[in-house]
Amino acid sequence: MELFYHGTSALFKTFDMAHVLEGDGKAKFGYGIYVTEAYTSAAHYAYNKKRPENKSYYVYTLEIPDMTADNHLFSCRPVHPSIIQRTEKALGEQIPAEATTVGKYFRKYVGNKLTGKEGTIKKLISCADLDAEKSAAKFFCEIGLEYFAWPQAQTNPDGPTNRVVLNIDKIHIVRIDKVELDPKRFQLIEGSEEEVSLDSF
């Protein structure tokens, strides 16, 4: 298991997919629960631009499954051959090589195919609507993937990652901290972390 963090302005004991789009309302890196390796990033993400009236900010420390070579799609790396094989077997068709060059193309291509989208390969790998993202997340979870992953800094692809967890049943909440953010840039105010007991709400 790995320790990751999730920032939110909501207090809860379990994750619920019904609330997935209540953060920024986007699925830019896929559909699921967004987590990060950096506590300070999670704190920053706790500020909800869609609900600025929420003034309580929380960072959840989570245990999530270990990332292995063939249980995730990485946004800017080639897709593992095992994932391509499992996908082709489940879909009953061969995936074009262009769609396997990086994980984000593969995710979008599969989501678009699952939702009946048509067009050029370039179109199918470059954008996906919310229905396609939801379909891709469900499909990849069913064939054994745990994550969609991408680097926190695009300039450092081998550095810390952010991830989308596909199966909420694999997330274990270890700790919840209430944190304070500076009101201008919404960055963590160091030393403001205060643990919230799971029994207190």
Annotate each language-model stretch with its function.
Residues G32:
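Active-site rim elements
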Residues S41-A42:
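A generic structural signal for short hydrophobic patches within well-formed alpha-helices
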Residues M1-K28, T36, A46-F201:
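Active-site and NAD+-binding cores of ADP-ribose-processing enzymes
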